[in-house]
């Protein structure tokens, strides 16, 4: 798994949960859900006051299934992960932007209240050197290395010359604006750098209406405004010549993370996932490092912690699936990404903080949700994993060669998922779902493609209907 630790300057775009108790469909159609019906279904059903006994959940999920004319094969010997909670809630949640209070809080805690300075671009000397380089391209003395080619050179030369006239001579410190500055009708941001305990820290907070709001604070070298500095890489162990090791325990990182969440004022967040990572230059980390020189690429090792909001101690699970997709035959009208706070911690402490898509505090609607027995969920999985992959048969007929899809289920996790209301990107219902994680390997004509670990299927734990995490319903 890879995640670029950088600040992607997003181009800001202008911009009724599960039909309760429905029969599981024979085609993977994802439908809008009716919220009132879902609340009713959550309140009336089996008595599962004792969580494990009521759900009849085994210690492991096991099985072996073949379908779609033997083109799809699924195996499972997976752990079943349940939250540390006695009851399963259902609730509601909303979307919000970062507030000035949020920004002030991040600067107070992560920058320790130190002065925020404007990010500096090229110095005057660097700008003049670049100007000479562009002019040499125009004279034909060196190859043209510029987006747009030779035709783009006059404009680039003019802009570079203009910048050089006012560029700083060196290390000038200009205090930055610490309130949100509007960049366009739908975009406002705060950004700059500060010196904290002898380290340069960068801060970037952006509200982008109808798209993705995000806040990033990081130590210089572990992220970059131009998306070029460092990556946190959680590699497949088999791809490394030696097992990945971290020289301090995970428990220490979680203690640091919990303390930071408390200092930031997050009262109901949970560390829902944690794993070791190594940090390496992004330009050199497109693939796992080679055996010859992989160690020379490593900046540090540490852990990545994922914090999510919770309701009644039940986590609102985050996944790498962003939730910003558009249904087929629908035009883009907005996106609502799932919320997460990610911390990257090395032996030297926090090196990267990322907060995506802030949400409101969840509101409890049903304290003890009634769920479908797990054996029924397992039966639905066995059927729907084949339905979801039934397209392989048509593909094989059209392609003229055989492709097989092999799935290995590695984890089954119960958590809350935010399902947005019909035609709304601002309000959603929190419902319990079963996420089936696993590896998928496709094989054809002697070739293989491994898609790594991902969520293969999400099933509503109340009524057993299928949910598309990308669409958000």
Show where each model-derived region lies.
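Positively charged n-region of N-terminal signal peptides that target proteins for export
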Residues: 1-11, 22
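C-terminal motif of bacterial Sec signal peptides marking the signal peptidase cleavage site
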Residues: 16-20
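Preferential activation on post-signal-peptide N-terminal prodomains/segments
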Residues: 21-332
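Activation/maturation switch segments at domain boundaries
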Residues: 30-34, 416-473
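Helix N-cap and loop-to-helix transition residues
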Residues: 99, 249, 372-376, 460
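A short, surface-exposed beta-strand/turn
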Residues: 202-225, 317-357, 444-473
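Segments that shape or occlude catalytic/ligand-binding pockets
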Residues: 253-444
């Amino acid at each position: 798994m890879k995640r670029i630790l950088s600040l992607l300057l997003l181009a800001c775009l202008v911009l009724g949960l599960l039909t309760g108790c429905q029969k599981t469909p024979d085609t993977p159609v994802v439908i809008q859900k009716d919220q009132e019906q879902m609340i009713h279904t959550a309140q009336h059903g089996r008595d599962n006051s004792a969580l494990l006994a009521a759900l009849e959940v085994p210690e492991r999920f096991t099985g072996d299934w073949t379908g779609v004319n033997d083109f799809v094969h699924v195996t499972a010997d997976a752990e079943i992960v349940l939250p540390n909670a006695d009851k399963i809630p259902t609730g509601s949640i909303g979307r919000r932007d970062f507030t000035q209070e949020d920004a002030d809080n991040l600067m107070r805690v992560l920058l320790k209240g130190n002065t925020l300075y404007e990010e500096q671009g090229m110095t005057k000397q660097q700008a003049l050197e670049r100007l000479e380089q562009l002019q040499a391209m125009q004279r034909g003395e060196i190859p043209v290395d510029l987006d747009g080619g030779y035709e783009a050179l006059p404009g680039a030369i003019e802009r570079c010359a203009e910048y050089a006239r006012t560029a700083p001579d060196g290390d000038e410190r200009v205090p930055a604006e610490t309130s949100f500055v509007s960049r366009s009708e739908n975009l406002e941001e705060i950004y700059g750098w500060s010196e904290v305990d002898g380290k340069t820290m960068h801060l970037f907070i952006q509200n982008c209406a109808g798209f993705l709001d995000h806040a990033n604070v990081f130590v210089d070298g572990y992220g970059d405004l131009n998306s070029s500095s460092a990556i946190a890489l959680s590699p497949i162990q088999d791809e490394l010549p030696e097992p990945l090791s971290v020289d301090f325990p995970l428990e220490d990182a979680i203690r640091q993370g919990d303390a930071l969440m408390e200092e930031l004022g997050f009262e109901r967040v949970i560390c829902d996932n944690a794993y070791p990572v190594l940090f390496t230059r992004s330009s050199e980390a497109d693939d796992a490092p080679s055996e010859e020189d992989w160690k020379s690429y490593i900046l540090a090792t540490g852990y990545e912690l994922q914090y999510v909001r919770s309701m009644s101690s039940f986590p609102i699970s985050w996944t790498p699936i962003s939730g910003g997709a558009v249904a087929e035959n629908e035009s883009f009208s907005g996106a609502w990404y799932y919320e997460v706070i990610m911390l990257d911690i090395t032996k030297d402490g926090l090196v990267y903080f990322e907060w995506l898509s802030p949400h409101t505090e969840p509101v409890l609607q049903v304290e003890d949700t009634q769920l479908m027995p797990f054996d029924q969920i397992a039966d639905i999985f066995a059927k729907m994993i084949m339905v979801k992959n039934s397209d392989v048969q048509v593909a094989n007929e059209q392609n003229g060669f055989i492709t097989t899809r092999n799935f290995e289920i590695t984890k089954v996790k119960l958590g809350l998922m935010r399902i947005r209301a019909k035609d709304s990107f601002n309000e959603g219902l929190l419902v319990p779902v079963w996420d089936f994680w696993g590896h998928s390997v496709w094989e054809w004509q002697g070739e293989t493609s491994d898609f790594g670990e991902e969520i293969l299927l999400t099933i509503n734990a109340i009524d057993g209907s299928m949910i598309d995490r990308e669409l958000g319903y």
